[in-house]
């Protein structure tokens, strides 16, 4: 929006074994995992963020026109999505410290930060849950999801019918024993690129509030027994008519 860059790549990744070794226990140790534990996702996702037509200049518009023409010439215009996802708004999150110190229960540490961001988004843009097709958090897991929904109900906002968590969607709880669900930077990124954006492109979802969640800890702070604050930034994603239409 400010015009500092015409085109930016944003990507994130995570790896199960590296996260276990750094923040929990070596895999060969064979420790028992509590049910509140999430399973770090080995995955990644990358999106390209472009400026709008007002800021992108002639080169950007020409590139879009060439891409559309190439699809038509190749007989693949139907492969181009009907709607192009765009960032229509953002709500920066604030650090929320709930005095959590258990690295085996990250969902509880991050849930209230997600609540704070969602409520702030409602206040900033004068919106309510029904204004969104989905409100999607990052990696709260099953434990964090229940905490989130409880706090939202206490605030007078019931989002249970439209809430989705990337960590829960990543794995099948019936066939994959990942306890509370998935976690990690790659979890939100992979679900965003592989599931959420295609839904917007197909026109099934018109407006989505995407709230990736994070826990602020390091190997040193964890070993010292310090608190694990949480943070969550919110991005509103909407579908606009594609340039190829």
Regions found by a protein language model. Give the residues of each.
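Claisen-condensing/thiolase-fold acyl-transfer catalytic domains that form or cleave C-C bonds
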Residues: 1-5, 12, 72, 76-82, ...
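Short gly/pro-enriched beta-turn/loop segments at secondary-structure junctions
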Residues: 3, 41-43, 127-131
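Alpha-helix capping at helix-to-loop junctions
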Residues: 5-6, 14-17, 54
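Active-site-adjacent elements of ketosynthase-type condensing enzymes
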Residues: 15-29, 35, 144-145, 191
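Short acidic/glycine-rich loop or secondary-structure boundary segments that cap or lie
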Residues: 18-19, 56-57, 97-98, 142-147, ...
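Condensing-enzyme catalytic core mediating Claisen C-C bond formation in acyl metabolism
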Residues: 22-119, 124, 165-168, 207-213, ...
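A short alpha-helix capping/helix-coil boundary motif
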Residues: 97-98, 128, 174-176
């Amino acid at each position: 929006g400010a015009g500092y860059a015409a085109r930016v790549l944003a990507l994130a990744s995570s790896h199960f074994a590296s996260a276990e070794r750094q923040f929990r226990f070596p895999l060969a140790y064979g420790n028992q995992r509590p049910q509140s534990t999430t399973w770090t996702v080995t995955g990644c996702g990358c999106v390209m963020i472009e400026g709008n037509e007002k800021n992108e200049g002639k080169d950007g518009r020409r590139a879009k026109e060439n891409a559309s023409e190439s699809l038509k010439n190749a007989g693949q215009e139907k492969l181009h999505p009907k709607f192009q996802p765009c960032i229509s708004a953002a709500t920066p999150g604030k650090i929320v410290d709930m005095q959590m110190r258990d690295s085996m229960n990250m969902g509880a540490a991050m849930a209230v930060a997600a609540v704070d961001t969602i409520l702030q988004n409602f206040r900033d843009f004068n919106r309510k849950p029904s204004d969104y097709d989905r409100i999607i958090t990052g990696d709260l897991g099953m434990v964090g999801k229940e905490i989130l929904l409880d706090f939202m109900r206490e605030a007078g906002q019931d989002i249970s019918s439209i809430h989705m968590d990337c960590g829960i969607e990543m794995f099948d709880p019936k066939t994959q024993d990942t306890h509370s669900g998935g976690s990690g930077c790659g979890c939100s990124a992979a679900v965003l690129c592989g599931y959420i954006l295609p839904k917007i492109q197909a026109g099934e979802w018109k407006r989505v509030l995407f709230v990736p969640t994070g826990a602020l800890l390091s190997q040193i702070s964890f070993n010292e027994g310090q608190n694990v604050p949480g943070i969550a930034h919110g991005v509103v994603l909407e579908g606009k008519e594609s340039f190829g239409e």
